[in-house]
Amino acid sequence: MSNSLQSVILKTAEEKSGSRCISGCMYQVVPTIGSDGKKLLQLLPISKSSGNLIPVVQSPVMSHGLKANTEKPVQVTFQTQISSSSTSASVQLPVFQPANTTKCFFTGAIDTTGKDRVTSVRTGNFTPPVSNIQNHGVKIHKLTRQTFTIPPSTQNDSSHFIFNTPSLLPNVNSSILPSGNHLKIPAHAEVKSVLASSLPPLVQQKILGTATTSTSGTVEASQIPTVVYVHPVNSVKFVVTKKTQTIYPKPVTFNTLQIPPNVATETQLKGGQHPQAAPVNSIFQEYLQPGIPCIIPVKSSNNVATKVLNTFVGRKNLGDNTIDTPLLNTNSSGRTHSVSEPIKDNALIMFNGKVWLNEKGTCGLPSKIDQQNSVSSDIPLKDSSQLVSSSIVTEISREILNSVLVKSKSFQLKTKSLSNSQLASMANLRAEKNEKVERPSFSVTNPHTMNQSTHCLKQSKTVFINPVFPDGFRTGQNAPRKGNLVQNIEKICSSVDAATVTSQQCVFRDQESQTQYEMASIVKKEIQEKGNNKKYSQGSHTNIKASCLKNDAEFKKLFGLTKDLRVCLTRIPDHLSSGKSFNSFNSLMKSSSYKDANIVVKKEEKKQSFSKKRKAETMKMGNTKKIKIENADDTVMSIMNGTDVASSQPLSSILPTSDISQHNIVTSHSTTREDKRTEAEHCSHEKQEKGTLSSSTSFEQSTFLNKNFMEDIFPVTPPELEETIRDEKIRRLKQILREKEAALEELRKKMYQKQ
């Protein structure tokens, strides 16, 4: 038998006398053309006699197999076993079929005393009117064997049964649709009706084609269509849950419609009553292209999203057309990224009877700013092979738009139940969007400053790491003037809101707004503190006065202070702020430094043990060189008091090298004498300070009574340069003295060892 023919073989063991049945016949399926010009499959019963096939009867019943795949023959074998008993007859119907998607309908006329037994390959809840059903199944070399078992019937009837082979999942090259998975729209999915012009140019070119472009290639405003945008979508496993229904097929010609399979399709068994004279019919429905992807409507809590897909796949008046879901493949390397923001979830774009699956990372709906700078990428798109007629597309579009409107109304009802704070935040974000003012964002575009400043904006938190603010606003040493602080903070908050709207595609999140407000307030406080510290050292008195008043008002707003707080500050008189007033402070510093040096010298002397001979020699040398050491001590004091600036040279130049040991020997005497001097000076300075303070008490009171507290300024003045230089000289001289003392100690040890 040639490959272009499909055969239905009926094998029997014995035939009961006096009764006409279907045994001993082999049916040959021959493709023909009907009167209406359609392709049909005709069943020709053939009698088997001495090994030759002889056609005996031509059955008038035909099946429409327009979509049948004649390259893969299907063999259906009936094995009928009839015994002498009138109640023990049974029929087994093993069916072998290829693994592609096939739907078969069988109607059989059973003998008056016959019994049927049917077994299904799929386990399900079957409820025929006769009794329960047993089921089992096996798989052989990618072929499915199905056996149906029906309990015996006591009446003269004919059993009618239809079974649908399990729909195998088409092969789809997609990262979100692996083998065994289908698309699912979750409950929180959003269904939007957007203009086609809002899509990226690449998607417009591949999905819309020439629908939005005129002959010159420009987009006409009056012909811009709308598309349905559904996101997010997920993938689910293939689940079999649908129950069976009882139907009565008629022996007529059936049209083979290429309708996408339902996710709940399974092996079904239907039983019922039908006249006995019904002949045997075999109707095959096959898919011409089993590898075409299909949309699967899955039961979901979101009725609107489910109805959208049911609109595309649940209509029976689509004719011979089907709906494809071409994929936006994202596996191409070396593509240029579009300026439009990549979507975080999978999405569906529906237009003109086609459903496009937009995978993760591909270009989604761009924002208004991104549309102006969108760049076409090299993402390959697969065009669909078939389109739905214009009238059907119009009906589908109307139904989808109605469902979207219902969704938007329900969203408005939900917003009424929100709290006042949430509504306020949403209103602020909408106002920022309606202004259409492009504000600079925090993101750094300069490659030289990329490592210095970074801005991270995520779903639920905002991280600032040395941010670069708009209009050259920078933290640290380049802090702006205090007068522009409030305006800059407002720009920061608005730019943060604008960036959030762009990144989240106008999805309002309360957590983000709260986090951004907290971060903005923290940055504001830090900038104010840094600006205040810098202006105290650089600003003039008038600027300091204005900044202090402004800072007070801002801090009152920040901390919620409502009462007037007055801080009274008094000025120090001019005679106290002169250079003489610092003598007491300098004397205190000198005395403390000398005491520290004295303690160090005494500790070193206690640790060392000298012999009696050594002590006697030191006393003699101290008497002979007493005058020279006093002169050296006077020079050191002049350096400490700042009277002789040119005497900042090292101590080795002041003291000759020959006198180093002698100077070291009488160091204790000179330090004790200097200690007495500093203590006397300290007492005199304290007395003088008390006198000046008591004399200036009346002056300060009169100043406080005569002048207003608003005119007072901070009395803190920066240290003078001369004092800083003097302190540095003192520190260096102390270090040099310690080094020289250490060198003298080594000389003493050497001299002691030699003696």
UniProtKB/Swiss-Prot annotation:
GO terms for molecular function: nuclear retinoic acid receptor binding. Residues 665-698 are annotated as: Disordered. A motif (PxVxL motif) lies at residues 565-569. The modification Phosphothreonine is found at residue 717. A motif (Nuclear localization signal) lies at residues 612-615, 625-628. Residues 671-690 have a biased composition (Basic and acidic residues). There is a cross-link at residues 270, 436, 590, 687 (Glycyl lysine isopeptide (Lys-Gly) (interchain with G-Cter in SUMO2)). Residues 678-711 form a coiled coil. GO terms for biological process: dosage compensation by inactivation of X chromosome; regulation of DNA-templated transcription. It is found in: Chromosome; Nucleus matrix. GO terms for cellular component: Barr body; centriolar satellite; chromosome, telomeric region; nuclear matrix; nucleoplasm. Keywords: Chromosome, Coiled coil, Isopeptide bond, Nucleus, Phosphoprotein, Transcription, Transcription regulation, Ubl conjugation. The modification Phosphoserine is found at residues 391, 419, 425, 584. The keyword Coiled coil applies. InterPro entries: LRIF1. Together with SMCHD1, involved in chromosome X inactivation in females by promoting the compaction of heterochromatin. Also able to repress the ligand-induced transcriptional activity of retinoic acid receptor alpha (RARA), possibly through direct recruitment of histone deacetylases. Interacts with RARA. Interacts with SMCHD1; leading to recruitment to inactivated chromosome X in females. Interacts (via PxVxL motif) with HP1 (CBX1/HP1-beta, CBX3/HP1-gamma and CBX5/HP1-alpha). The Pro-Xaa-Val-Xaa-Leu (PxVxL) motif mediates interaction with HP1 (CBX1/HP1-beta, CBX3/HP1-gamma and CBX5/HP1-alpha). Belongs to the LRIF1 family. PANTHER family: LIGAND-DEPENDENT NUCLEAR RECEPTOR-INTERACTING FACTOR 1. This is Ligand-dependent nuclear receptor-interacting factor 1. It comes from Mus musculus (Mouse).
